[in-house]
Design a protein with these regions (language model features):
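Short terminal alpha-helical segments
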Residues: 1-33, 83
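Alpha-helix boundary/N-cap detector
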Residues: 2, 23-26, 43, 47, ...
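Extended alpha-helical scaffolding segments
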Residues: 31-72
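Amphipathic alpha-helical binding modules
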Residues: 64-92
C-alpha cells in the first residue's frame, strides 16, 4: 500500500533536518525537539509515530521522499529510532 499524503508529509518533515547529516541517528534528539515537540505541521507526537509506522510498513523508498544521499536502510533505521523515542517519551 502506498504511503498516504499526510504520512509522506510527516516523514518529509522528519527527514529534512537530517538530509545533510553524516549519521541521521545522531540527530534524533534534535529532530524530536525541533519537529515533533513543536508539533510541526500541526501534528501530535502520536501522529508522527503513526506516520512512521505507516512508512516503515510501506514498500515506498522513503529515501526518495526528499533529495538526499542516505540509503533507504539508513532512513528506515533513523525513523524507527525516532518512533521508539517518541514512544518512550509518551510512556513517561
Amino acid at each position: 500500500m502506498p504511503l498516504s499524503v499526510r504520512s509522506a508529509g510527516l516523514i518529509r518533515a522528519l527527514i529534512y533536518p537530517v538530509q545533510f547529516d553524516d549519521n541521521p541517528l545522531e540527530a534524533v534528539d534534535r529532530v524530536i525537539d525541533t519537529v515533533v515537540r513543536t508539533r510541526s505541521l500541526d501534528a501530535t507526537p502520536e501522529e508522527y509515530r503513526s506516520g512512521i509506522r505507516e512508512a516503515l510498513t510501506s514498500a515506498d523508498r522513503l529515501s526518495d521522499l526528499i533529495p538526499q544521499d542516505h540509503s533507504d536502510d539508513v532512513i528506515r533505521r533513523y525513523l524507527a529510532e525516532v518512533a521508539r523515542r517518541i514512544e518512550v517519551a509518551s510512556a513517561q
